[in-house]
Amino acid sequence: MIGGKEKEVFAKIREHLNAVESTLMAFRKLFEVYIRGDVERAEELLKDVEREESRADELRRNIELMLYGGAFLPASRGDYVRLSELIDNVADAAESAAHSLMFAKPIVPKGLEDEIIRLVDESLKTFEYLKGATLALEDSVDDALMLAKKTETQEEDADKIEYDLLRKIFSREDISTYAKLIWNQVITKIGDVADRAEDASDQIMLIAIKRR
């Protein structure tokens, strides 16, 4: 049974999820405009990514304070603290990928523009499932488990796109070695967004199983 303090924590978790989602939306826009060649606009969007990530981080700290202030049974508090940290890592991964792109500003490989955006979109889909799984913890552990498993499946799909994209980049003779190394870093970091979402989904499974 979820009590009053627990409902307050879930309200704050929802707010945290929305902040992480805002980070990811700014991250997506940044990549889209960079791929189109608008570097100046991408620089502006980097500030949006950083601002939203900072907001998410502050909300994570608020959740931890609420938990240590007495919400949930002592045995469960650590699980939810860990979950908030893992969810926050998704925003961190997006910010890191954005920094890697904007610091190096590599030339976009011709013909691969759509595939880069596709990787971004497929990576962000993992968070959509993660968000649903997290919110489901409040009312239905079965739904939480189902959505956590979908997060894992989506991460695997994003992985396949990531590896295929890297293979294409490294097989191209018209891309310099330097550009290949930079894109390897950027693309791997985009994939990290999906990886971090999967990490959080594992924690949701743990919490859901304990509550069954």
Swiss-Prot record:
- Pfam families, alphabetized: PhoU_div (PF01865)
Coiled-coil residues = none
Q: Report the SS bond pairs.
A: none
Q: Where are the transmembrane segments?
A: none
Q: Which superkingdom is the protein from?
A: Archaea
Q: Which family does it belong to?
A: Belongs to the UPF0111 family.
- The name this protein goes by in its record: UPF0111 protein PH1389
Q: Which organism is it from?
A: Pyrococcus horikoshii (strain ATCC 700860 / DSM 12428 / JCM 9974 / NBRC 100139 / OT-3)
